[in-house]
Structures are given as structure tokens and as C-alpha cells.
């Protein structure tokens, strides 16, 4: 950097000495310096003359005078011509038109002096460093002298400074208005450094049309690109937005991030040569490093640290960290105290400031409502921020700007808003000239912050001994936000700590130190006691035990309403408050930028909640409605919150719930999930109703129409779900974010407990009942159910997150890490009913009147037995950290069916979910509801069903006719001890009858419907529930197609593809895992994997029902192919899809039939799959003469086998489920299996056909249940339930491919391990 200018005008002879003579033409008295210098381009020597301000010459004066001339640099061809009055100078450069004067060096010249004017770049080369320094000082001093002299007058005649930005002109440069803090840069410079570059049409240069010759202007915090002959920068980039920069040869590039006004991208520019490019690079890196060090020394935050003597300021996290710094006073930092961003893009010249500016709206919207003095009716102070309303609110002009002088002249700083470029005394070297004495008024502070923002006027009438704010001695209405009574500019980015902290002299006891102007809405966080002296300038953040601790004093009227305002700026809410205060001035300096967060300390629960009913100030004038965020971390439960002291602590750990010992303060789940799901416009629920609006007990809650903001009868309306899923056209796309429970303004009942402190930030669409109510009291009715019930904040969370409960053997620990397309259920568990006839919840007609399936998390569902929600006080009231990772968009609103899903599966790659939990019904579906009716098996999912959490396995209405993406490559490792389902005696269902789980009806994002009475007569004739030994008998194919919901939906819906789901259950199962039936695949769906059925590898120690897995079958065919299943030897590492199956020769293929089609082998578990039919019965695969060579080549065949003889499992005979029932296959035990020791490398499944498979019916083209069945391995697994092909893995008969045929159950039992054959490579 150049050295600072010398104080005072330099000697008339400097550098190489004056070449003065008595020639009147030379106007000797105005010549400051002259001598030979070289021009940069060609190196020609020219004679340069530096003239100070004055007339054009004596001759001109004698002729009648001429307008005074600005300081200028002239050059002549030679000294002789200058002395001999040979003619006019070859060139005249007005110095006040210079953007900057810099020392430079390039490849040719080491000692350059560069002058950057509005329209050109001019550089001269000195012979040595001393000569360069002499000219540089002379130039800068002359410019500084001219500016200081022009402070109170207009520009001189020849001056172009009125049109220049920044200190040099009437308007502040958009990028350089903050340079003159202290004496770091010469006072002559609008910018610290200026380079002339040629922006190339590459990256942002092309997309933003930034090409051509620009001036790259570096200021303390920004770099601006000023086009030639332009006054304002075309683009201003914050240094903090620069991700990286570099140079190569003569090119220099900058990569900026998303927060830049241009958006993310790169800017490429070409300098004169590589030396200049390197200089640009190094200089910008140095500036970025300095800024980084400044921020490290002074932490970035939207809020202020409290206390003027704080050496370790408390940094409150801000919503958008790129907005501002914490501005410590110069007395503490010794560094520049400026807002983090310095300029506006395309702000009108009249609005420009001379010292700095705060970033108003986001950086790109400066010209509109951003912060132009003309745009919002708010003149800009010299600090670049809106002025506080006062008698001297005039738009800045050049005379205002320069009236106080610049450089180190703080004595000229006045009380006018246009106090000067250094009005805020930006460094320690500047005395605090404008700081008012502490005795200005009883409400002012003696601040060491250096800008004297000490006044804290109180509301009128609150404290009679204090003067009214409007009668402040200095006549200016100050605000505690920024504008102080001393007349310092109200700079929102410029607030000192004493404005927000509790300095020893702070009058914080009055809790309402603010004027009635919008600027002062940034309310100060109160110290907990009157003096705050013992806090030593810190804001109290401790956790009081009770209100006896140190609650701050409540004030009534305006002050009480002010307490609930967070320390913030730019507050905007999408709703209108119940009552509004009239804002005296439509200016909002304190609303300008910050979204401040305040931790307040009143309330009962140990969580932070927003303040009073009117929880955020609603001002009539919101100048920036597009960028307001209302983040309040307060704890006021109601205007009369007398429920005990809140500790002021906000739990920030994910999943960790804060507890408190209160009887009514079971803090359940202080967890806020922020998982991205389907996105739509936000909608917030403003007035949640009380329990008085609840329907009577047992009544169903009808689902409101999708897409509208719901109002739920939640407990006190404490949860505010600003879910962006609920869109409405009037939303402007912004939502208020509450980190606390806000009571309804109409319901200030202090007895109501606010529920969960966390907002549902997930853009997931709510269920059919909208965003769920916080309690299941809606199901039980009456307000008595709300008493003593904790606020389960997860009720507003996506279905993935819920508290575990083990009531009625129903544990909800099943977590899904799949990529569901449909809505993730909360693992709908259907509690055992007192009467089997009670069957399912809601009406039996399948209407969407289930109150809790869609809206209430499972842990809060009311149990018909207990009569109270499960999982409440009896359960662990803690937040369950989500172990379910959604890879695709969750769909929880019926409105999601407005957006068609792609039929092409988005394979997320092989996700493996390892669930260690005591799953009550993980592996076995809950018996009573599932066995309730035939329709229940096709319309309801159990929590144990892996498909119950899968998008395409989600049951719903049959109106959803879209295809679901296959949940490919999903492996579920379930270490659980499932409990056996209670067998039911109702007819019409079998335990294994889960044919409807993956039916088309199951692909809907709706909650499970109550089982509907089957409308088909054949469903009334289904066999009775089997004996325990018959648990694995699968339903007949006709039952799968004739049941009520399935029959009505399978023809009109294209089912999802739940391919490649492998559930490996390691646990002690009371009963065998229930088979899950894959749905038929649509004809046009591209099968992403040969394993379309749900393969469950159940490695369990069966304690009962072991023989149920065994099936009468023929001895194994030695020529039969095997299904090779590979477990990942690396222990469940999620492999990239590119490395999943690089080739099909990694194992010895049992049959080469699929080897040519390796592109479909993207399952996580199936490496090379080949199934060959049993030769028994001479049935062919899929009914053809030849088996298909690959899943993709299998022809869809339709078969409706007759209803008869679903063969029961015979527990007395060795099973052939896997293929070695007492035959030639050698028994294999898990303990001795090399495959188990090596991580279950390969499992050979021998799927055998059955005799009599020729008895299958012929295909019927209309049956979609068998569409594309043979296109995947699930379809090749055969049909189950017909007379010829019953069994879990029965070989397919002649075209008989019902939905029950695609389940391959591979069970490694503690005994009877003959069923498994582990194949080593």
C-alpha cells in the first residue's frame, strides 16, 4: 500500500525539484511539482507538471478570469516547450476525477504511479523508488488538500468529483465507501486498490454480461467492477463471498459463492501482464486474510455481544451468517468497525454513503428497496445506513459528505447525520469526538464504544423521572437500535455492545429502552437485574432456577409488549398480529438488516419459547418484506406466564431433549428435523385452536383439503408448523421461523402447556390431516386429555421422527433409511383391539377419517385398551434421533399426487439399514388388525413390514394410479427380537397374506386405510386363519386379486416396484417372519434389478414355529440353478452404484442366463441370479417353452389360478424352502458355515417348482397383477397359493404369477439348517 499522505501541503519544491520560472504562462504559484517521467506504454519521457487548484493562468485571469481549476497533472513533450509557452499541454488529468492513485509495478516498469480516472487508466514510471514516492506523495497530498478545502462548498468548475462515487464524489461509491477508516489507506483513495482488467466472457462474465474493460476496485470488504465511463460499480462482490481466487499468466479469476449478488460462479479477467495479475491475486488474498483475521478477532454474528468491556464476546448464531459482523467498539478492537458489506449494487447516486453501509436487503436488491435513500424514503447516513428520524434528515450531498472532512480530522465531525467519512471513529487512532457525555440524560450511557450510541430513551410515561425521548436534549429521537442521541448515524451494522449489553452504567432495569420509532424496535436484551453490574457487561445467559432467580422486571403497556420482541431487524411475518401499534415513522433502521435472536428468561418449561402472545413486532411499514426472518428464541409462554422460570437454555444438540423437573414439563423431543423433502411454498399455522374445539371421544377428524394451512386442536397452539409444503398463492415464499412454542394470541391461557419447542422445518408435506396435531387428544376428545401431557414436538415432525414406545408390544424403533417415493409412514402399528370386530380404526369404508394414522405419531396414538396415548408419561419422553435417511422426497400430503413421479427408479445405491431395536412387531405383522379381514391384508401395513416404510409399499387409496419408483438396493439388517402376533380367529385372512402390502393400493402416499369389507364374493370364501404350523401358507392367487381393495385397485393402478429389498433379520423371533408379497410390475416399468420381490434373510434363533418354514417338496434337482446372493464382505459399506456390479464374473455364475444382462444387476445383494424351474410337472418358466434369458426379457404373463387348496405348511417334514429337504443337499449350520464366518458371502436359494403346476390357468391379458412379473427375479420365484405352485418360493406355474410369488424367504434357523446352502466362490 502507499504510504499515508503527509499532513499539510508539501513544499513547493519536492522530488526532483521544481522547474519554476517567471513565465506567466506557467502560473508558477500553482505548480507543486514538475519533472520528467516516462509514460507506461512506450516508455517515452515526458515533462509532467503537477498543479494545485487555482485559475488557468495569469493571462486567462487578465482576459477576464476563468473558473477555478481543480488540481491537475499536465504533461508536455519537453520542459522546453513548457517553459517557452509553446502551446497547451499534451494532456491534462484532473486529479479529483481519479478513482484512485496507486503505486504499481509491472513487467516493464518497477516504479509506476497509476491514476485511474472515470474513463481511462494513466500510469507514469519513475526512475527510482524515491522519485516514485515523491510524486506519489505530492499527488495524494494535493488531492487530499483539495477535498478538504471543498468540504463546505460545491465542486470547482473543472472538477468531475461531483460525479464520482465515494469520498471523491457526491455519492458514495458502491464498493469503496468504507475505505477511509483510520489511516490505513490514503485519504485520497476511493478504493484501496484499482486495477484495469478485461473481463472475459466466461462463467459469470458470460451469464451476467460482464465483459469488456472494467476497473477492478478493491475496498476494505468488497471488490467492485466499474465499467469505463461509469460512475457506479456494475457489480460489487463481498470479499467474504469469494470462495477462491487465483491467477495464471495474465489472467486472474475469482470464484464466488451463492451469497454473492451474481450467484455462484467464476469471473475471469485479464490484466496487463502476469505481474499485474499476480499483484491482483496477492493483494486480494491479503485483503481477504485481513478481513478473516478481523472477523476472528471480532466474531461474526447478527446479534451484539453484551457489555462494552467484553473481551470474549458471546456470539449468538445468526440465520444468515454472511450478513454482518459483531461490531465491537474500536476501543476494544483497535480495528475498523464497519458493517460487513460495504456497498449496494446499482444504488442511485443520491443514496450513496461515504463511510460504509450495511447490507440492506440481500446484496442484490440494493437499488429497489435495498437501502437507497430515495427508495425507502430513508436518507442514508454517512455510515451507509438509514438515518434515524430527526431534524436533519436530508439526503446526503457532496457538501454534507465533505463537511466534516476526512482523514484524521475528527474535530470536524458534527451532530449532523452527514457527519463525515470518519464519523464513527473507525479506529482507535480516532478520538471519540462525537460521543455525548454520560450526563446527557438519565437514560444515556457513557460508552466506550467510540461512537457514542449511549442513549436509551424510555417509553413515555413509564418512568417519569426520565425525559421523554422526543424531548431529548439534542433534539434527535434516538433509538437503542443504532441512532443515538449524540447524532451518530444509525448504522444497523454499527451497533456497539453497550447498546445491547449491560454495561455497568446501563439502565437495563427498565426493559424497554427504546423509542417509539421503528429503528428502536431492536430491543435490548434485558439484564436480569436492575444494574447488571455484576454481569460485567455480559448479557446473562445462565439458566435461572426459578423466577426468584433474577427475572427482569415486567413493564406494562408498551414496554410489556416490547419485551416479546426479539432483538432483531428486518422483522417480517406472514401474518397480521392481533393488535398493531402505530409506527410513527415509516423508516426502519433497526429493521434494516439483522435477524437478531434473543434469549429471554420467563416461562415454565426448561425450553426457550417465544415471548408474549404478540411474539414479534408487527410494524405497519415493512420496507423489506422479502427478506425478513423472525427468529425468536424466547421463553414467554403467555402474557401471564406464571408457570415457573424458564432456564433460558435452548438445546442445540440433535436429538437431545431438555428435561425439567416440573410435573407438567416432560420435554419430549426437543429435536427439530430439517430433512429436505418435497418442496412447495410455505404456510404457517397461526391460530392453533384449543382442546375445546376437539371432537368428542372416538370421533374421527376429517382431513382438511390438501395445500391449505391447517389449524389443529393442539395443546395451546404451541407449535407453529411453517411447513413449506402447505402452499398458498398469497404466500410470498417466506416463513417465520419460531424456535419456541408460541401461544395463540387469542388463547393466552397460562395453564396450557406449550408443546414442542421445535418447528417442523422439513419441507415435507403433511399428511391427510395436514400437519399433525401435537397430541392424540383429538382422538380421545375433551380437554381433560390435555392435562399432564407433555408437548410432543415431534408431532409436527415428519413421520420418520417419533419417540419410541413399547406399549402393547408395539415398539416404534423401526427406522428406515430407504429412498421412499411415497410418504414414509410412521410404521403404522395397529394395536390389538379389545374386540376383533373393532378391527381397524376409523370407518370401514376406507374413508380418510382416520384421525391418528396420518396425523399422530405412533407413540401418541391412543390405545383402545389403555384409554390414553401410548408413549406419553409412561414412555421415554425423549426425542428420537432420526436414523432414517430419506434419499428421495417424502410425500406426506395428498397434494403430492399432483406431481407425477418418474417411472424410472432412482436407485440411491445400496442402502443398508442396520436397526438394533426390540421391535415388537418388526418381523411379524400385528395379528389382530392384520387378521381382521381379508381387506386388511391388502390395505394395512404392519410396522414390521419393511414395506411399511417404503414409499412404494405405503398403503393408501386406490386412486393413486402412478407408478412408484422401485426402492432398489435396500437392505435392512434388523437386529430385533420380534414378538409373536396374537393369532386372531377372524376369518378371511392368513397370517402370511400380505399380498396387498405391495399392491397398487400400497403405492400411494396416503396413510393406511381401514380395512374395507371385500366386495368380491370370493373374499368371503377364503380359508380360515391357519394353525400356528400353517403360518407361512401364502394366500391363493385368486385371493390376492379378488380382495376388496386390491380387486378394485389392481386394474386401475400401476403398482410400485419394491424390488431389491432385502431384510436381514438377526434376532430371536417368536414366530417366523411374515412373507411380504411384491406387487405386480407395470408393463412399461423398467426393472432396475432382477430381485423385485422382498427378500428377507432372516437369521434368527427360532424359538417356536420352526417347522413352519418347512414345506413338502420333491428332492432337489441336481441340475437346478441357484440364486446367488452376496452379502457385502465389507460389513455393510454403502457401495457406490458404479462399483456394485462392475461385472457379473465376480462369482462363478450358476447359470449364465443373466450374464449378458449385467446392466440390470444393480442390487446390493444379488450378484448373479439365475433361477431355473423345477422339471416337475414339466412346467415352464412363465408359461413359455424356454425360460427367459434375463429378467428384462421375461414376457409378462397373466394367470389367475383357482382359489382351491392353498397347501398348508407341513411342519413334520424337512422343508424344501431353500431346496434341500432331506435330499442330496448336505445340511449346513450357521456355526460351521464358511459363508457366515466370511460375512455371508453367498447364499444359494434353490427354488423348486411343484407338481401339478400345469394346472394353472392360462394368461389373461387384463390381469395387471402379473405384469412384468418375470422381468425380475421376484417374478421368477414362482406363484404361491394355486393348486400347483403353493409355497413361499414355489416354482412358477404356467403363467401363474400372482403377487404372492416374489418373496424369497431365506431363514437360517438355529436348527433345521438344512434349508440353507452357503456357496463359496
Curated annotation (Swiss-Prot):
Annotated crosslink Glycyl lysine isopeptide (Lys-Gly) (interchain with G-Cter in ubiquitin) location: 1314
Biased composition annotated in UniProt, kind: Pro residues: 1-10, 1005-1014, 1072-1082
PTM sites of type Phosphothreonine: 347, 517, 524, 575-576, 771, 1071, 1148
Protein localization: Cytoplasm, Cytosol
Chain residue ranges for the region called Disordered: 1-32, 51-73, 299-536, 834-871, 888-1091, 1110-1198, 1251-1275
Span of the annotated motif YXXM motif 3: 649-652
Residue ranges of the motif YXXM motif 5: 734-737
Chief location bin: cytoplasm
Subunit-level organization: Interacts with PHIP. Interacts with SH2B1; this interaction enhances leptin-induced activation of the PI3-kinase pathway. Interacts with GRB2. Interacts with PIK3R1. Interacts with DVL2; this interaction promotes the Wnt/beta-catenin signaling pathway.
Name this polypeptide is given: Insulin receptor substrate 2
Organism the protein comes from: Mus musculus
